[in-house]
Structure formats: structure tokens, C-alpha cells
């Protein structure tokens, strides 16, 4: 075969293969378009399916066309009913770890906000960690001076529980240097306090939209809980303080529905001091354990009914739970009066368990270090010193800080009671450490039917950071 014949033969074979390939494609398209729709199985075309991922429902609209899936993520629909939250608290034998964000450790090399006052609150479908940023990042020059409580740069933001407060996953909630937030079953409600000390304003947000305001009525640093507010059958409750931190101030309880204030009441508490209440629902009422920043080392207790009537006093237990405080052996306790004669204080919490009480406190009597939770027999109603359970969460070699309460709703747990949970803030930096900044991370614990061993889930960041050495 001469060269020309070889070229013709190769060309003919190649042309034949091309024609065969085209014919196969035509047959494939014909079968796909004409034959497959006739088999009566159209279920996969333009189909909306619901899939579950880690307790979060994600709705996907899947459109199939020539073996190609086009997936469109659809916003989660709002619930059409309010949460009840009239169930009793579950009885807890111990508290198991729920989450830990490790924000400061991650922030040494990651884009993590400088924060304080973290807290947790839950909707029917998720729990989120909320925190008040300083408008700056860890290990950055703008973190200098963030020991200051109030500034125009502070904002309330949130992440899914367990995530660090990082810039990539955080969601803006409100401009605020004091805040509270809770979910009524349909939407989130937020109260964010901001502005000058003498004329601060609390802005109520519902579903992300400003819906109402509260003006400072005493002109002395209007402030709120720094933890979850409480919603019962669609009505949400929270407590605010206006006035001095070291003597008699003014206190009010508020009630809102779908972001509009529908009631408020002045809390008469002469000789007592209420700040930074940690509240939770229990048997149709709101129970709060607060901070006395004036004299008491026992904690104020406020129980609010749906009609805004209330009972106010002090945690009866014969053990103090504020910091600083004196020796347990020298403390007698009182259900009605401040005891201990120690100024200052720290945000804390307690849970009623029948007539017992779980009460959290720092291990140190003089500084915000270590953290333990004690169950005191009859401590809700009597000056009892009888500890029937004790659990260490942060050892006394490590810093702690604020602590507060929240509950897991029955929509999340499928139980017939509300699971009691708490968080512990672990403050790092100024004023205790040689840094230019102050920030915190947190550990979150929830009640379980088992005793849990003592351990220390402390912050663990190695300080100082690079910015502190410049």
C-alpha cells in the first residue's frame, strides 16, 4: 500500500469513528428526552426534599436536567406557633459539657473578635452563642484598651453554639454594650442598650427589625441581663436596672409580644440591689437569680408571674455565691436581706430544683478564678448549708468570670421538661494579665441524669500575644 492509500485509509477510519460517535450521542439524547419521561417516574424532576444535617433542617429544591442537579438552598420557614415553656425544669444529677468555643486560643492566629459577656439562648431548632464585641480583633492594634465596658464600637453578635466568635461565621444582632436575647418560637427578640451613660437607650428588635425603645428613666447607665431573656407562650420577659452600681438603684421588669412592649412593672427592693439577672422559665413563671453589687454576697432572687406581679428576696441557702465573699462557715444566709457586707460582685446564676437549689460560684472567695456548682438541700426555701452534690468546671488555677443560665426547650429535646443549662465565661487579659486587651471564651454545660466527674475546661490560651510585645 503506497503512502497515499495509507492516508486515505486512516482518514476514512477516523471519519467513520466520528460519525459513529455522533450517532451514539443522538441515540442517547433521544432516549433521555423521549423514552425516560414515559416510564411514569417523574419524582426526581423539580422535586423539593427535606434533609436533616446535625439537628438542623435544610430545605433543598433539586431540579434534575440531563443528569445535572441544580440545588437551590431555601431559607428555613418561620415556625407558625409560639413555644409553650410552661413545663417544669428537669431534675439534674450533674452537668455535662455542651460546647466550648476556645475563641482566644484560636484568635492568636485567627480572625476572632475581642468580646465580653458571652451567653447562650435557644430557639426551637438551634442554640446560639451571643457575645458583645469591642469592634476589634484579637492580636490587633484596635484591641488596645478593650477592658472598657461601654463604647460606641460594641455590638451584639452571634454564632452557632460551639463556634469561636470569628468574623466569617458571626452574625450581627444589635448595637449594644449591654444586651439580652431570646426566641418566642417564631422569631428572635433582642434588647440592645447603647448610647451615653446619662441618656442610654434600649432598642427592642424582633426578627432583626427595630420595633420599640426604652429610654433611660434614671439617667445612670441603663443596663440589662447579659444573658438569655425568657419567653412563655409568646410573651417575653426581661429585667433592667438604672442607677448606681454601689447603692440603691431602680429596677423594672418588662414584657413584650412580637417585639412590642405590652407591660412593665417597677420592682420595689429597698435596701437590696439587682443587676445582671440570670433568668429561666419554670412551671409558667420566670425565675431569676441576680447580682447584688452593693452589699450582699448572697444573690437576689426575683420570680415574675405572667401578669408581672413578682416576689423578690434573696437566695435562702446558707452558703454565699457571689464574689468577693467571706468564709462559708461564717455565713448564715437570709431569704429577705443582703448578707455578707461585701461590695462589688459578679454575674451568676442558680436553678430551683423543687426546694433544693443548684448554685454556681467561683472557687476563689476573692477573685474571679475557678468555678463550681453546688446542690444545696432545701436551699431555695431555707438557710441550709447541706451540700448534696458538688461539681468543678474550672479549677482554681484558671480564670473564670460571669456565668448565667438558659434552658433547652422541649422542641429540641423531645422531653416533657426544660433542661437546665449554664455557661461560664473565662476572662483573659487585663486587668489580671499583662496584655493590652481584655476578652473571653466560654464553656457551656447542660443538666443530665448522671453525675459528672470534676475537671477543668479552662480557657487555655498562652499569653501574651504578639501584639502585647510590641
Curated annotation (Swiss-Prot):
UniProt keyword DNA repair present: no
Cofactor: Ca(2+)
Residues that bind substrate: 116, 150, 275-276, 291, 368
Keyword terms, alphabetized: Calcium, Disulfide bond, Glycoprotein, Glycosidase, Host cell membrane, Host membrane, Hydrolase, Membrane, Metal-binding, Signal-anchor, Transmembrane, Transmembrane helix, Virion
Annotated residues for binding of Ca(2+): 292, 296, 322
InterPro entries to which the protein is assigned, alphabetical: Glyco_hydro_34, Sialidase_sf
Assembly description: Homotetramer.
Protein name (Swiss-Prot/TrEMBL): Neuraminidase
Originating organism: Influenza A virus (strain A/Guinea fowl/New York/4-3587/1984 H3N8)
Amino acid at each position: 500500500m503506497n503512502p497515499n492509500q495509507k492516508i486515505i485509509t486512516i482518514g476514512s477510519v477516523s471519519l467513520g469513528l466520528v460519525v459513529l460517535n455522533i450517532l451514539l450521542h443522538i441515540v442517547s439524547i433521544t432516549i433521555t428526552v423521549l423514552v425516560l419521561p414515559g416510564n411514569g417516574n417523574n419524582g426526581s424532576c423539580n422535586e423539593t426534599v427535606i434533609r436533616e444535617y446535625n439537628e438542623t433542617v435544610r430545605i433543598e429544591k433539586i431540579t434534575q436536567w440531563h443528569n445535572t442537579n441544580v440545588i437551590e438552598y431555601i431559607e428555613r420557614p418561620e415556625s407558625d406557633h409560639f413555644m409553650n415553656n410552661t413545663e417544669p425544669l428537669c431534675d439534674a444529677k450533674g452537668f455535662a459539657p455542651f460546647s466550648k468555643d476556645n475563641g482566644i486560643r484560636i484568635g492568636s492566629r485567627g480572625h476572632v473578635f475581642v468580646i465580653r459577656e458571652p451567653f447562650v439562648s435557644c430557639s426551637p431548632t438551634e442554640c446560639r452563642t451571643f457575645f458583645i464585641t469591642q469592634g476589634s480583633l484579637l492580636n490587633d492594634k484596635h484591641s488596645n484598651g478593650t477592658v472598657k465596658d461601654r463604647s460606641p464600637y460594641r455590638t451584639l453578635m452571634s454564632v452557632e453554639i460551639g463556634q469561636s466568635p470569628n468574623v466569617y461565621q458571626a452574625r450581627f444582632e444589635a448595637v449594644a454594650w449591654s444586651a439580652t436575647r431570646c426566641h418566642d418560637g417564631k422569631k428572635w427578640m433582642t434588647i440592645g442598650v447603647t448610647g451615653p451613660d446619662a441618656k442610654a437607650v434600649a432598642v427592642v428588635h424582633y426578627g432583626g427589625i427595630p420595633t420599640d425603645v426604652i429610654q433611660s428613666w434614671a439617667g445612670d447607665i441603663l443596663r440589662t441581663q447579659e444573658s438569655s431573656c425568657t419567653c412563655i407562650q409568646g410573651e417575653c420577659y426581661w429585667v433592667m436596672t438604672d442607677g448606681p452600681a454601689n447603692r440603691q438603684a431602680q429596677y423594672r421588669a418588662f414584657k413584650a409580644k412580637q417585639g412590642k412592649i405590652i407591660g412593665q412593672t417597677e420592682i420595689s427592693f429597698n435596701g437590696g440591689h439587682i443587676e445582671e439577672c440570670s433568668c429561666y422559665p419554670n412551671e409558667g413563671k420566670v425565675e431569676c437569680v441576680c447580682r447584688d453589687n452593693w452589699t450582699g454576697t448572697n444573690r437576689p432572687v426575683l420570680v415574675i408571674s405572667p401578669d408581672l406581679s413578682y416576689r423578690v428576696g434573696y437566695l435562702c441557702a446558707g452558703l454565699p455565691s457571689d464574689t468577693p465573699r467571706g468564709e462559708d462557715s461564717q455565713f448564715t444566709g437570709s431569704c429577705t436581706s443582703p448578707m455578707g457586707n461585701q461590695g462589688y460582685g459578679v454575674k451568676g446564676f442558680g436553678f430551683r430544683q423543687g426546694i433544693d437549689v443548684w448554685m454556681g460560684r467561683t472557687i476563689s472567695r476573692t477573685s474571679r478564678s475557678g468555678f463550681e456548682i453546688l446542690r444545696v438541700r432545701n436551699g431555695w426555701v431555707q438557710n441550709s448549708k447541706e451540700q448534696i452534690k458538688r461539681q468543678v468546671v474550672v479549677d482554681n488555677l484558671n480564670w473564670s468570670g460571669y456565668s448565667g443560665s438558659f434552658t433547652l426547650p422541649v422542641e429540641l429535646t423531645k422531653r416533657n421538661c426544660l433542661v437546665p443549662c449554664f455557661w461560664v465565661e473565662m476572662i483573659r487579659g487585663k486587668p489580671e494579665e499583662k496584655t493590652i486587651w481584655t476578652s473571653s471564651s466560654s464553656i457551656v454545660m447542660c443538666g443530665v441524669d448522671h453525675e459528672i466527674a470534676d475537671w477543668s475546661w479552662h480557657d487555655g490560651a498562652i499569653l501574651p500575644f504578639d501584639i502585647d510585645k510590641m
